[in-house]
Amino acid sequence: MKKHAKVYYSENLVEQVNEFETSFEIKPLERGLGNTLGNALRRTVLSSIPSCAVFGVKIEGIKHEFTVLDDVIEDVVTILNNLKRVRFFYNPSVFSQNSIHVASFLGQKAGQIYARDIESHSGLKIVNPDLYIADVSKVGALKFELFITNGKGFVDFETNKKYVNEVISLLESQIEGSVLAVDSDFSPVLNANYQAVEINSASPIIEEKLNFSIKTDGSIFAKDALSQGAKILIAHLNLLADVENLNKFSADFFGDQEIKEEPIRRFSNSIDALDLSVRSLNALRRAQYYKISDIEKLSQDDFENIKNLGRKSVQEIMEKLQNYKNENKGEN
């Protein structure tokens, strides 16, 4: 009987941009399995990873999207398009008791309004706080509420319009106006690609490795997205593995995967947290330095001996490393 080689999985840290955009390597695989696994994983992570998104927006005094707002530069359609792009960190436990949550901006400031000015009533965290919403010339001229739910994939505004009509009596609000449905893009994965490469073409037994790259919107780590995609595939395949007992399997296979509440803390020891220039970051990675703990004991001479690090880059690293230490003195 043919023996199968042990398969290894690793993250390609040299090509890592940050923990939300990176690539992975899986090898050795039997010939043909690279494309089989890669295609299945790619389709799954792009379409089936659960998340949350805005499905409805209420703007004070607005009954339809073609109404004009005084003292606001943008029209209602533009504001709606901006608001539906606000992304929240998804925690399934938050939505287990209540499937609809509210976030709002109640006109407490004038000037340029960003996603960071929006307050979540349920403690949901906004992962793109620098997203521009609108420019307001008068305090109180713009007030709005976002209604958020969980789901998968893409839901168009026509479908959400029906959903709004179904749940309208459940939507608690502090302002007057109509709830306007918007498109909902629940997928936290922005991009996923794969490549199957032969790794021993000189051998009579041809094997492959799978290179899989993935980029998320910041609401989930790339590694977690890949893990969830694999678990979803395994759950479906497990149903087929025991054909004698298909009707005995529980639907729990397809429940939401629990996500850690504080993803940014896992980011804290990565050199990405120093916010270095691309040149400095790449030079450190090529020298096999990936964590702050790896470089904090290096001297200036040690840094200058690292290939492709000039004086300005060394100075930048040392200054930002010192700033990082000062900011995190009390967190040990």
UniProtKB/Swiss-Prot annotation:
Keywords associated with the record: DNA-directed RNA polymerase, Nucleotidyltransferase, Transcription, Transferase
E.C. number(s) listed in UniProt: 2.7.7.6
The keyword Transcription is assigned to this record: yes
GO annotation, biological process: DNA-templated transcription
Region called Alpha N-terminal domain (alpha-NTD), residue ranges: 1-244
CDD domains attached to this UniProt entry: RNAP_alpha_NTD (cd06928)
Domain of life: Bacteria
SUPFAM superfamilies listed in its UniProt record: C-terminal domain of RNA polymerase alpha subunit, Insert subdomain of RNA polymerase alpha subunit, RBP11-like subunits of RNA polymerase
Catalytic class of the enzyme: transferase
GO cellular component: cytoplasm; DNA-directed RNA polymerase complex
Region (Alpha C-terminal domain (alpha-CTD)): 259-332
InterPro entries associated with the record: DNA-dir_RNA_pol_insert, DNA-dir_RNA_pol_RpoA/D/Rpb3, DNA-dir_RpoA, RBP11-like, RNAP_asu_C, RNApol_insert_sf
Catalysed reaction equations from the record: RNA(n) + a ribonucleoside 5'-triphosphate = RNA(n+1) + diphosphate
GO molecular function, one term: DNA-directed RNA polymerase activity
Family annotation (Pfam families): RNA_pol_A_bac, RNA_pol_A_CTD, RNA_pol_L
Assembly: Homodimer. The RNAP catalytic core consists of 2 alpha, 1 beta, 1 beta' and 1 omega subunit. When a sigma factor is associated with the core the holoenzyme is formed, which can initiate transcription.
UniProt remark on domains: The N-terminal domain is essential for RNAP assembly and basal transcription, whereas the C-terminal domain is involved in interaction with transcriptional regulators and with upstream promoter elements.
Similarity annotation: Belongs to the RNA polymerase alpha chain family.
Function noted in UniProt: DNA-dependent RNA polymerase catalyzes the transcription of DNA into RNA using the four ribonucleoside triphosphates as substrates.
The protein's name in its UniProt record: DNA-directed RNA polymerase subunit alpha
Source organism phylogeny: Bacteria, Bacillati, Mycoplasmatota, Mycoplasmoidales, Metamycoplasmataceae
The encoding gene: rpoA
